[in-house]
Amino acid sequence: MAAAQRPPVGVEEALTRIATVADAPASTQAAQALWRMPLDAPVIVHDRASGSSWRRDSATGPALPVVLRNDQPPANTCITIDGAPAVLLLLPLPGDRDGLATLFWHEQWHCVQAALGLPATEGDTAHLDGEAGRTALRLEMRALAQALSTRDEHQARQHAAAALGYRALRSDAAAPPTRALEEEAKVERNEGLAEYSGRAIAAATHGGDATAAAVDALAKADASQSFVRSAAYVTGPAYGLLLDRWSPAWRRGLSAGATLPALLADALGVTWRGAGIAQNGAGYGADEVRTEERERAKERERRSAGYRERFLGNDAIRLPLRNPSISFDPRSLFPLDDAGTVYTPLTVRDEWGELTAVSGGLLSRDWALLSVSGGVVDGAGSRWTGPGWTIVLREGWRLERGGDGWGLTKEWGSGVGDPGDAGE
């Protein structure tokens, strides 16, 4: 009989820490109460150093290896294994208990969101990287922080109404304004509700509430260099906690088209697009924010020119995408107008293999084309490297340089993807 495969150092400890979070009675009760269904998908951990994944059948059982599909790049996410949802977490885990609990319950929510009638959606929030969008968002977040932290009921409502006003102001500056609201709402329903759930359930573990953590997250986000997809991670919990305060039943019957700001406006009894915004924003440091964002806009133009040279120049390497699986850091996205978005770092898997770009790559808006920096390219056979990236090709694919630069070619005689191949 073959010896059982042993996990890398740290895997057993990680699974034990996760079990402690998952089995805490206060947390499981809070999860059930929050969404009226259990959040108990099995958990898989992925060790990036060895490239291996592991799970346990029980809290005390041995770690067992798991093989991820080619279209499941390692990421903190919810995946499907044997037809059922499972939480996938990357090692190393967050070092603190609250951080781990927030991440764990965030991903658990993703595993039930479809059952809640809230399917995963992606929103195009590139307007959050422009000067006007960032300015209004930062002022909205500052107003949300004050609404959460003040004990005076009247003042809290005023700050909440101001936050809604800044959301309306930001959407009015976008083109078209209604689309901006809809796109932001998509991300808030997806990542915002997941992060709200993670923070609320994590706080319940020690009998507290998530307000202090939400306010701290808003303060840290104020200095963020990219809000394109990450803003919902802080605005979602803030709106959720304010709704808990003024409309406790808001989660019941939550629809796939719901927007958290509109729900809050209803709870406050205000017309949300005409909410009572303090025009000068003095209480939120508006002059300071506007000055900082004007300077950032100038720096953004310089970065944009550099990215265009790297990813749109003649020596850039362009890789076609047909059915990509992509993992990235949502805090570091850089929209490049109609050309797409720069993701740093980035891992992409497709039919031709896997690319890892620690220095980033440009994805077209329809995710049909990936571009990475050209320049000095080295390699042979299946493994190639370039400035800040590595490609590992599947059998039957080659990276070659032609008259138009580097590109991928398929060897039809290899039997991989030949015409008539029925596939998997």
What positions do the PLM features span?
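N-terminal mature-domain "stem" immediately C-terminal to a signal peptide or N-terminal signal-anchor/transmembrane
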Residues: 4-65, 86, 94, 342-345, ...
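Non-catalytic terminal regions of proteins
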Residues: 20, 233, 252-424
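Post-HExxH zinc-binding segment in Zn-dependent metallohydrolases
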Residues: 46-51, 115-176, 180-211
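Catalytic zinc-binding patch centered on the HExxH motif and its immediate surroundings
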Residues: 61-83
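Short pre-active-site segment immediately N-terminal to the catalytic Zn-binding motif
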Residues: 89-104
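Short, flexible loop/turn elements at secondary-structure junctions
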Residues: 93-95, 109, 117
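Active-site recognition of the HExxH zinc-binding catalytic motif
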Residues: 102-115, 195
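Active-site-proximal alpha-helical
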Residues: 178-210, 215-278
